[in-house]
């Protein structure tokens, strides 16, 4: 895995007779952002759910750190690898899924305390540091229902980072944000990348990805059609299907 934080090779996924992912190959270098684009139904969301172990893969491999998830393992070994993978991969879902009965601080320390067995005092100290990083330290004792959508998203990012993931996945992070909040999110994510984090972001916002992603991967029909530097793919796509998609997305 030298030179890659995550490497995906020959990834396949089907639901019944429907092939959703048809041999996906890519890798993401450390401390970079990969933006994944494509029309609805192209396989983006299924890819994300495979990367964090929410969907069982039917072919190929996913490697992150020393964890190698592959099709064909016994049920016991596969579930064991999935548990290991989830400790490496954090996810910020489109709808955040914060616990409404827990405070902001409680949401962030829940997994470190109960999954990683981090001492509560240590987890709280780290949580306050993360909240300060996302500009919400003063909201530590508030509850999710009292927060705006943008604030809830920042809590979700802090919660994911509290598990010290090697890779952070973000699903449509701009879907509920106004332009000012989108610019703020772009700056926040690049700050975390500069601090050493690696990310994969699924988004329909080309403008957002143009300011945050290092590389872009375009999917169509369950295939990787084009993958390259963000500026090249977004401004000078090499494949006609990528060009058509970008023209329609404008």
Spans of features found by a protein language model:
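A short, surface-exposed alpha-helical micro-motif characterized by mixed small hydrophobic
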Residues: 209-211
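Catalytic Walker B motif of ABC-type/P-loop ATPase nucleotide-binding domains
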Residues: 168-171
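Helix-to-loop junction immediately C-terminal to a conserved catalytic motif
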Residues: 52
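Conserved ABC ATPase signature
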Residues: 143-147, 151
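A short, proline-enriched helix->beta-strand linker immediately N-terminal to the Walker B motif
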Residues: 162-166
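Conserved ABC ATPase "signature" region
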Residues: 68-71, 120-139
């Amino acid at each position: 895995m030298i030179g890659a934080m995550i490497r995906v090779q020959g990834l396949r996924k089907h639901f019944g007779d429907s092939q959703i992912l048809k041999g996906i190959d890519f890798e993401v270098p450390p401390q970079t952002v990969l933006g994944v684009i494509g029309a609805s139904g192209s396989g983006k969301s299924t890819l994300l759910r495979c990367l964090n172990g929410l969907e069982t893969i039917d072919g190929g491999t996913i490697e992150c750190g020393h964890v190698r998830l592959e099709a064909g393992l016994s049920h016991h070994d596969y579930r064991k690898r999935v548990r290991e993978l989830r400790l490496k991969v954090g996810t910020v879902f489109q709808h955040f899924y914060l616990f409404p009965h827990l405070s902001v601080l409680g949401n962030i320390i829940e997994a470190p305390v109960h999954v990683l067995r981090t001492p509560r005092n240590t987890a709280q100290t780290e949580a306050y540091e993360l909240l300060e990083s996302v500009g919400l330290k003063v909201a530590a004792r508030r509850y999710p229902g009292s927060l705006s959508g943008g604030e809830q998203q920042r809590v979700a990012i802090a919660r994911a980072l509290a598990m010290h993931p090697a890779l952070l996945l973000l699903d449509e992070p701009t879907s509920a944000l106004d332009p000012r909040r989108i610019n703020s999110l772009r700056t926040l994510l690049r700050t975390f990348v500069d601090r050493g984090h690696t990310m994969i972001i699924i988004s329909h916002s080309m403008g957002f990805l143009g300011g945050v992603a290092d590389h872009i991967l375009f999917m169509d029909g369950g295939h990787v059609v084009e993958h390259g530097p963000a500026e090249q793919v977004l401004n000078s796509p090499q494949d006609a299907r990528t060009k058509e998609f970008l023209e329609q997305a404008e």
